[in-house]
Amino acid sequence: MKLSKFIKIPLFIFLAFSVNIPASFAGESDSQLAAAFENQQSNLQIEGDGIVSKILPDDTNGSQHQRFILRLTNGQTLLIAHNIDLAPRIDDLNVGDTVQFYGEYEWNSKGGVVHWTHHDPSGRHEAGWLKHNGQIYQ
């Protein structure tokens, strides 16, 4: 049975808006992060999300950072280094949780690091954030 164009367009619109698409468009950010990793790029503002695969001890040298590893849908891993001197810690973080992020990507051989996931008190750097269980940490 062939659908007329008058049925196809409303059906397409209905289907397009009934799908639960994450706000970060994970596929797009995953491909941006994969390209940044492959090209060894740094200093990129990026938004995305991933699943916590490992929780690491805090880095307490200099500014304190909460650290954990996210696995993206494309398999790439990212170290999240979240400055807990400037932003609240995610206290209820567990392996398997989803975390959305917006921050600065820095290349390394293990997949990269995202930092600047907080506000900048001096206002010179774009503010970043983490989102976990509906709460934003900035």
Predicted regions and their residues:
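Bacterial N-terminal signal peptides that target proteins for export
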Residues: K2-P10
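Compositionally biased regions
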Residues: K5, V19-I21, F25
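Bacterial N-terminal signal peptides
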Residues: P10-N20
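OB-fold and OB-like single-stranded nucleic-acid-recognition modules
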Residues: A23-Q138
